[in-house]
């Protein structure tokens, strides 16, 4: 695995709130179409994704996970569970984003159970290093262990953690023991 396909970046890539990266660019099949920030997902004609692997061994491990997921030996109610995590601050922007997505889903189907783990709905604990949300951390862990089809996060983050308070960290994710109940994980984050 030596060549990488670059991610499409919006033409105005220095705008703080409206810049984005998307592989949808590679799925637009009609000539003249361009990705726009307000464009409906209905105009995409092909599902596209990536296997985040840098070595053959990593790729094989990911393919094995996909095969296990496809064979679906642990079917159950967990597949109707959608978990929403929204960062605090920013005038509730992240909470509003999550609510808008949920509202759109509810117009298409009402068969989902929505578990909302919005930081603004929980009490913060103050420590010497800053705020933490232990109840959110615990609720996320419980949701992952019980099984959730989707874990959607909107807010600040990086490759090591989501939220300044680290409600999800890389080390926590590596400790998850949820084989057979892997969530689709979406992060709308910096």
For the regions a language model picked out, list residue spans one by one:
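Cysteine-dependent hydrolase recognition
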Residues: 1-190
């Amino acid at each position: 695995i030596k060549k990488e396909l670059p991610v499409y970046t919006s033409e105005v890539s220095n705008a703080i709130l409206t810049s984005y990266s998307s592989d949808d660019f590679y799925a637009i099949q009609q000539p003249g179409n361009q990705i726009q920030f307000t464009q409906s997902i209905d105009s995409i004609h092909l599902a596209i994704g990536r296997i985040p692997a840098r070595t053959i061994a990593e790729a094989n491990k990911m393919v094995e996970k996909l095969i296990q997921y496809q064979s679906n030996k642990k079917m159950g109610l967990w597949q109707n569970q959608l978990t929403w995590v929204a960062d605090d601050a920013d005038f509730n922007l992240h909470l509003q984003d999550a609510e808008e997505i949920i509202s759109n889903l509810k117009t298409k189907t009402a068969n989902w159970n929505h578990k909302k783990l919005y930081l603004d709905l929980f009490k913060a604990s103050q420590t010497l290093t800053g705020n933490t949300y232990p109840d959110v951390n615990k609720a996320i862990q419980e949701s992952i262990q019980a099984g959730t089809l989707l874990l959607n996060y909107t807010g600040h983050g990086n490759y090591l953690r989501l939220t300044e308070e680290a409600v999800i960290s890389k080390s926590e994710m590596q400790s998850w023991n949820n084989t057979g109940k892997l969530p689709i994980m979406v992060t709308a984050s910096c």
